[in-house]
């Protein structure tokens, strides 16, 4: 059975055979102590440990940042792509992806993941972003393949129109646009402004 993964700036969403799981794409850093670690484990709060610091990930990070106020909510992605200013982005993303996908049901199980189109208003490295995500997913024992986000939307939203029309995704980091005719992509691109702008 294959799985789907939408890798968004605001949320990561996994489509599994029996359910859809969502995790906020954010984290906070807290000091490590035995009591803190035990509390996180007891409350089943996802975290990753990097350089003697605990990074609480996902929805729990957002909630803690709201409650404590003086804790900075950080994001491993910005403007629809990997955040180049966030050095802990990769281990955090690996944890978010693992929490959503879990272990493969069979070795090399297929995961299709979304990537943005090339921005028309900014010079960015979409290929690098795609390669890093593939490495993170494949590193968990999956066999992954990228799909343009607008194309993925077209496969669900344009089915009744013979896959002909326009698909637009308004994400937190960018907007993805695709123009399709009879299932073929006439044009696909992104604009590097989204809901966080």
Where are these regions (language model features)?
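Nucleotide/phosphate-binding catalytic cleft detector across ATP-hydrolyzing
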Residues: 1-170, 181-197
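A structural feature that tracks compact, well-ordered secondary-structure segments
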Residues: 176-178
């Amino acid at each position: 059975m294959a799985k789907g993964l939408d890798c968004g700036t605001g949320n990561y969403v996994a489509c599994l055979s029996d359910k859809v799981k969502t995790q906020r794409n954010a984290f906070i850093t807290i000091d490590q102590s035995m009591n803190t670690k035990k509390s996180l484990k007891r409350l089943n709060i996802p975290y990753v440990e990097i350089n003697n610091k605990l990074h609480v990930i996902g929805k729990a990070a957002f909630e803690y940042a709201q409650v404590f106020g003086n804790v900075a909510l950080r994001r491993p992605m910005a403007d629809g792509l990997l955040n180049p200013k966030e050095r802990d982005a990769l281990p955090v993303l690996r944890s978010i992806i693992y929490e959503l996908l879990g272990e493969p049901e069979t070795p090399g199980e297929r995961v299709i993941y979304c990537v943005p189109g090339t921005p028309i208003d900014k010079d960015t490295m979409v290929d690098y972003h795609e390669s890093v995500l593939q490495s993170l997913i494949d590193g968990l024992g999956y066999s992954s393949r990228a799909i343009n986000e607008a194309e993925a939307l077209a496969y669900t939203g344009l089915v009744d129109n013979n896959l002909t029309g326009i698909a637009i995704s308004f994400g937190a980091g960018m907007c993805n646009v695709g123009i399709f005719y009879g299932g073929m992509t006439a044009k696909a691109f992104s604009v590097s402004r989204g809901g966080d702008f």
